[in-house]
Amino acid sequence: MNLEAFVLGSGGMMPLPNRHLTSVLLRREGDLFLFDCGEGTQVSLRRLNLRWKKISVIFVSHTHADHVTGLPGLLMLSSQVDRDDPLYIIGPPRIAEYIETSRRVLDMYI
């Protein structure tokens, strides 16, 4: 089994030009798993040429801003394209409220 880890962001509070907020992607035999989704996650995915459409699960450790502020943008992008498989989000109970509020405020169709 081949497992690769990509640190997409490791900063806190405020993203810097070369250091985005918390996010790690694991790739295992073509499957992609995202752990946290801080601001700048989409930029890092693009810079590393990682196929964000292949992310099958997003795990959210907790709902501090530096771990979730990239989620609305990634979900909005995901809602605009055809996905081969569903996207699952696993996290603490309040993550559902955060996603629903973001969906409503940003008028997302997810």
Task: Explain the meaning of each model-derived region.
Residues M1-I110:
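Binuclear metal-dependent hydrolase catalytic cores
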